[in-house]
Amino acid sequence: MLSVAARSGPFAPVLSATSRGVAGALRPLLQGAVPAASEPPVLDVKRPFLCRESLSGQAAARPLVATVGLNVPASVRFSHTDVKVPDFSDYRRAEVLDSTKSSKESSEARKGFSYLVTATTTVGVAYAAKNVVSQFVSSMSASADVLAMSKIEIKLSDIPEGKNMAFKWRGKPLFVRHRTKKEIDQEAAVEVSQLRDPQHDLDRVKKPEWVILIGVCTHLGCVPIANAGDFGGYYCPCHGSHYDASGRIRKGPAPLNLEVPAYEFTSDDVVVVG
């Protein structure tokens, strides 16, 4: 009887007294055997409904699969209708909020605004970086008290006759002039009573052939030009002050003569200023 039922092909399940099920690759929705009746699960009201633990307790132990075609599974996805879709309108510009309107019309204005913000930020960052670098470099320089006590030694043989040489001393320009015999006689012959800041030439020099001055105009602090002006001494291009070869003010708005620093000759060829 069993052999006849086995050879009957499609009628084997009808002729057979027993049936058997073969597990497939997918778990069917219905089991071959009728499961025992069980009580429906009761939801614990103390737990929040929309949480991972509660959802995993209500869902099946394994993902539910329904066979739609030949070996084609379809998974079951839990859909939540209470999830709010984020709105990014606050981060978008007003010109591009309307999705039905072309953004090409406002592209130039939006690009111009972006370029303006970028340029402004770049200038601000560059200015801040300049200040930081300046402070860093200035911190490595000598302090004010060191500069105030500093001295400079000048070799006079390097300055030819009739020429003026400029040096930097205590952060200021220092003029050392090698005067000719003509300049010495010319400045010595000037009437002191005609000067705005009366001072004789011999009172401003220790050696007639050497004039040592601080090259800062007494008007507003500009640096005069040597061997220029109406009197052949120094000329301030800022406001037109004229000084003679002794550094005395002769014409223009400057009220005083050029300052003479403290100096001494250590030898016939060397002078120390400071």
Swiss-Prot record:
Q: Does the keyword Glycosyltransferase apply?
A: no
SS bond partners: 222-238
* Cofactor note text: Binds 1 [2Fe-2S] cluster per subunit. Fe-S cluster delivery to the Rieske protein is mediated by components of the iron sulfur (Fe-S) cluster assembly machinery that reside in the mitochondrial matrix (including HSC20 and LYRM7).
EC number in record = 7.1.1.8
Offer one example of a GO biological process linked to this entry. Answer: respiratory electron transport chain
Give the stretches traversing the membrane: 111-137
Modification after translation is described as: Proteolytic processing is necessary for the correct insertion of UQCRFS1 in the complex III dimer. Several fragments are generated during UQCRFS1 insertion, most probably due to the endogenous matrix-processing peptidase (MPP) activity of the 2 core protein subunits UQCRC1/QCR1 and UQCRC2/QCR2, which are homologous to the 2 mitochondrial-processing peptidase (MPP) subunits beta-MPP and alpha-MPP respectively. The action of the protease is also necessary for the clearance of the UQCRFS1 fragments.
Spell out the coiled coil positions from the record.
none
Those parts of the protein on the Mitochondrial intermembrane side are 138-274
Q: Topology: which residues are Mitochondrial matrix?
A: 79-110
Q: Mind telling me which SUPFAM superfamilies this protein's record contains? A: ISP domain, ISP transmembrane anchor, Non-globular alpha+beta subunits of globular proteins
Q: Where does [2Fe-2S] cluster bind?
A: 217, 219, 236, 239, 241
Q: Which reaction does it catalyse?
A: a quinol + 2 Fe(III)-[cytochrome c](out) = a quinone + 2 Fe(II)-[cytochrome c](out) + 2 H(+)(out)
Residue intervals of the Rieske domain: 187-272
Q: State the remark under miscellaneous.
A: The Rieske protein is a high potential 2Fe-2S protein.
Protein name (database record): Cytochrome b-c1 complex subunit Rieske, mitochondrial
